[in-house]
A protein has these predicted regions:
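Expand to "…catalyze enediolate/carbanion chemistry for C-C bond making/breaking, isomerization
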Residues: 1-433
Length: 433
């Protein structure tokens, strides 16, 4: 008597029908991106941007740290850190602010710039492009940079795309036709998928007329309207946005204050940890999990300016907001003032160091099981989880929370394996040995 009941020819009918669905899911959800995600984006008005902006911000951040937290104990008290953790991270924060104070900068033609006469915005678009080109020549750009244009609403659509074109045209003229590494355009206040489609079309057109390689221009979405959470028919809006933007979309950034205002929340209660914000961020996570699109949280708008106790209160609030983001799976956020950089890195470093031992055990065990399964011919279909565990170490190492040597020691991986940035490739390398 046969061990199974369903005949093979009958089984094949519905098993084969799964092919299209499984392929579609694999294409839509490739897993976490192995590329380096910045831990923050620093925003600054386009009229203020200079080629040496990153180093100047670093100097101001170091000055703030030296003045308001000159030692680990003071920093621990100011932002509520375990003193032992503060001892471990303090020199690392100083080193980061000296070596690479800004990971990502956004030249802002929207809220940070305001509404100005057309000739004025035209001029600043070209001046900002000149400064970026100069920074490219001088080697003073942060690892990632971009511009935020105005929304593609009826009021601003032509103004927005003119700034996009003016900036890029001048930049390519002054940079021998090259874009900066990791250049991105930020599209704000999206209310309809057609706006995302138009942004993608503008990128297509610019690349065509300037003879740029297809896909060179990438953009990120601001999620700061209720229409970017749910569409008018009640469906989640982000999948449609992503479909319209295609492979050009690299990130989705949450806009705390516009979103809470759109929800009718009064100014006194518009802040990062409002339950309405958690809801929106969780919708973003569910909609974009596994797509490889980065998520970024918003900004703390209480600036660390004034007497020592005022700065310390602002620092503690900022550190709490950063930690809230990290705990909820948002590994990037916005900084609006140079004195927020010390607390950004302190909070991020503390977060990664606190979870390092547990992450180390999980990754070591996971790699062993995955390699064994593959070695004996079994199908290992959880590479996405492995990439997520690997990304913990890559994030910690990239931002400066741990050194490459510490990552090798804790992860059980070799330098070559870590630098591959790919869990699947690590498995292949181990099987070949």
């Amino acid at each position: 008597m046969a061990d199974t009941t369903i005949p093979e020819n009958a089984l094949s009918v519905f098993v084969d029908s799964l092919d299209k669905g499984n392929v579609r899911v694999a294409e839509l959800y490739p897993g976490d991106s192995p590329h380096r995600q910045p831990v923050h984006t620093v925003y600054g008005g386009a009229h203020l941007f200079k080629a040496d902006a990153a180093s100047k911000l670093g100097a101001l951040a170091l000055k703030a740290l030296t003045e308001y937290a000159p030692d680990p104990a003071t920093l621990a008290t100011a932002i509520g850190l375990d003193p032992a953790v503060a001892d471990r991270i303090y020199r690392r924060v100083v080193d980061k602010l000296t070596r690479e104070p800004v990971e990502d900068f956004r030249i802002d033609f929207e809220d940070g710039f305001g509404n100005r006469p057309d000739h004025e915005e035209d001029g600043y678009a070209q001046i900002a492009a000149n400064e970026v080109a100069a920074a490219m020549r001088d080697g003073t750009l942060p690892p990632s940079i971009g511009i935020r244009i105005k929304p593609l609403s009826e009021e601003f659509k032509r103004r927005s795309l003119r700034t996009f074109d003016l900036f890029l045209t001048r930049l390519l003229e002054r940079s021998e036709g090259k874009l900066p590494p990791n250049f991105v355009v930020t599209l704000p206040k999206i209310t309809a998928p057609e706006q995302v489609a138009a942004m993608a079309s503008a990128c297509d057109a610019f690349e065509y007329w300037r003879d740029l390689k297809g896909g060179s221009l990438r953009f990120e979405l601001m999620v700061e309207t209720t229409q970017s959470i749910f569409a008018s028919d009640g469906t989640v809006a982000l999948p449609r946005f992503i479909a319209e933007g295609g492979d050009r979309i690299v990130a989705a950034h949450f806009g705390t204050y516009d979103y809470t205002a759109a929800c009718g929340i009064t100014a006194a209660h518009q802040h990062m940890v409002h339950p309405a914000c958690d809801f929106a961020r969780h919708v973003m996570q569910v909609a974009l999990a596994g797509t490889g699109i980065w998520l970024s949280d918003g900004a703390t708008n209480i600036m660390p300016i004034g007497p020592r106790e005022v700065v310390h209160r602002a620092w503690r609030l900022h550190a709490e907001h950063v930690r809230h983001s990290l705990v909820h799976g948002f590994y990037q956020g916005w900084d609006l003032h140079p004195a927020q950089l010390p607390t950004r890195y302190a909070a991020v470093y503390a977060f990664f160091l606190e979870g390092l031992d547990a992450a180390s055990d999980r990754l070591r065990n996971f790699v062993e099981k995955a390699a064994q399964a593959t070695l004996v011919g079994e199908v290992f279909d959880d590479a996405a989880t492995g990439q997520g565990l690997l990304n913990y170490f890559l994030r910690a190492m990239n931002c400066g929370a741990i050194t490459e040597e510490e990552a090798v020691e804790k992860s059980g991986l070799t330098v070559a394996e870590l630098r591959s940035r790919s869990f699947a490739q690590i498995l292949q390398l181990r099987i070949k040995k």
